């Protein structure tokens, strides 16, 4: 597992634009850029070692909507690890994205509905599969967070511990886009109980959150941040240097 977490800028795509939602509500969005490729370039220039892309329309529609934009970003930064989630429901989509140059594909809703699909994807694309677990009050949510299930996030994580999943992206829906601080307790608990490295997401606001997560580098391999770096309450480069111990 990773001893030094990496800061991972989020680029959420909606209608061809770079946006941020509040608690996953599509109607409650803030547009930060009309040019997602330029936004990716900005974060790379500021020191990003990895990017987190989300096809929001894809997550709600169940099919990829932003293929061209995603391909353009991957082409612009061929050596940069890029992960993507949203609308990944079949093997063909995974293959197309990996062929386009993406490093990791995040399976969310499909992982809940069909765990065997995750195992198959891990066999077919070993080392490239991440499971996205979105939760509200510890319970898994699916379909772009529109549906809260009766499955515990920790229970879902345990199902994938031995099938070859690279890591878990854990998002606390209640905090996502709200700038209320990261849920350290649930994030660390998921990593310890699930047995897989976790990428923390949702609620990261400023350096205080980075400081709270740093001690858990043995189980948290990345920290996704969106609104905080877009609104300037967190400096990406400064945060990464802090995690690096510099």
Curated annotation (Swiss-Prot):
Q: In which pathway does it act?
A: Amino-acid biosynthesis; L-histidine biosynthesis; L-histidine from 5-phospho-alpha-D-ribose 1-diphosphate: step 4/9
GO terms of biological process kind = L-histidine biosynthetic process; L-tryptophan biosynthetic process
Q: Which Pfam families match?
A: His_biosynth
Return the EC number. 5.3.1.16
Residues of the active site? 12 (proton acceptor), 134 (proton donor)
Q: What cellular component GO annotations does this protein have?
A: cytoplasm
Query: Which InterPro entries does its entry note?
Result: Aldolase_TIM, His_biosynth, HisA_bact_arch, Isoase_HisA-like, Isoase_HisA-like_bact, RibuloseP-bd_barrel
Q: Organism's domain of life?
A: Bacteria
Q: Which UniProt keywords apply?
A: Amino-acid biosynthesis, Cytoplasm, Histidine biosynthesis, Isomerase
Q: Which GO terms describe its molecular function?
A: 1-(5-phosphoribosyl)-5-[(5-phosphoribosylamino)methylideneamino]imidazole-4-carboxamide isomerase activity
Localization in the cell = Cytoplasm
* Catalytic activities: 1-(5-phospho-beta-D-ribosyl)-5-[(5-phospho-beta-D-ribosylamino)methylideneamino]imidazole-4-carboxamide = 5-[(5-phospho-1-deoxy-D-ribulos-1-ylimino)methylamino]-1-(5-phospho-beta-D-ribosyl)imidazole-4-carboxamide
- Return the similarity comment: Belongs to the HisA/HisF family.
What HAMAP family does the record tag this protein with? HisA
Q: What is this protein called?
A: 1-(5-phosphoribosyl)-5-[(5-phosphoribosylamino)methylideneamino] imidazole-4-carboxamide isomerase
